[in-house]
Amino acid sequence: MLCLPVFIILLLLASPAAPKSLETRIQNDLIRAGLTDADLKTEKGFLSGLLNVAGSVCCKVDTSCC
């Protein structure tokens, strides 16, 4: 009879140390993927903005590049 309470206490102590569930890992992966996609979109927007500025400067200097 003494083993049952000890077993329950050990079970309660071990449960928070359980590994993450599959759903939690998938959610973390999706969050990381979303952040990566956001970074890529920002870089593309930044590069296209630079190309637009370079094009407008080129058109002001020489009309053959427009």
UniProtKB/Swiss-Prot annotation:
Annotated localization: Secreted
Propeptide, chain numbering: 20-54
Alphabetically ordered keywords of this record: Disulfide bond, Secreted, Signal, Toxin
Post-translational modifications reported in the UniProt record: Contains 2 disulfide bonds that can be either 'C1-C3, C2-C4' or 'C1-C4, C2-C3', since these disulfide connectivities have been observed for conotoxins with cysteine framework V (for examples, see AC P0DQQ7 and AC P81755).
GO molecular function: toxin activity
Family: Belongs to the conotoxin T superfamily.
Entry note about domains: The cysteine framework is V (CC-CC).
Protein name according to UniProt: Conotoxin Lt5.6
Organism: Conus litteratus
Lineage, broadest ranks: Eukaryota, Metazoa, Spiralia, Lophotrochozoa, Mollusca
